[in-house]
Amino acid sequence: MGKTFFQRGPEIADFSFEMEGRAVEFLMLREDLLDPIVSGNKFRKIGLFQEQMAAGGFAGIASCGGPFSNHLHALARAGYLFGFSTKGLVPGKHFSFLSPTLQDCQKWGMELEMVSREEFAEIRYAKESPEGLAANMLWKGEGGYSEEMYTPYQLLDFGGLEVDEVHVGVGS
């Protein structure tokens, strides 16, 4: 496997200015520039999952989400960019077409498996791998849900800079 997201690192933009005779240093961590699909919280979650995958000797990451899941979209893209396998479990055994999101996932090499709504309800927040999932795949619930999903926000690295305040933009 090649580089991970954490090795890649986001750009820091400098918007420093002077106000009332005092220098104000304003730096912006531009995680949105990492990749058009995998950035921000997805960059942090998937970077953490990559480390867990490597430490556990897994070949890839499996997760679940709906037909328009941003999480599956980002996971498939990350697998494509960084050379690891991905699998997505999606509710809707009876769909005869794939959404544009799932078409992208397939284009980036994600193996898609359609499951019933009942199966999806059982696995969406499961901590253990669903029955039948290959043992060499690291399992993460819907949206990347896991106990450690909040850890990435503790991993903010400002390249050795001391910061007084951190402001976070949210696009939910």
Predicted regions and their residues:
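PLP-dependent amino-acid enzyme catalytic core
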Residues: 1-172
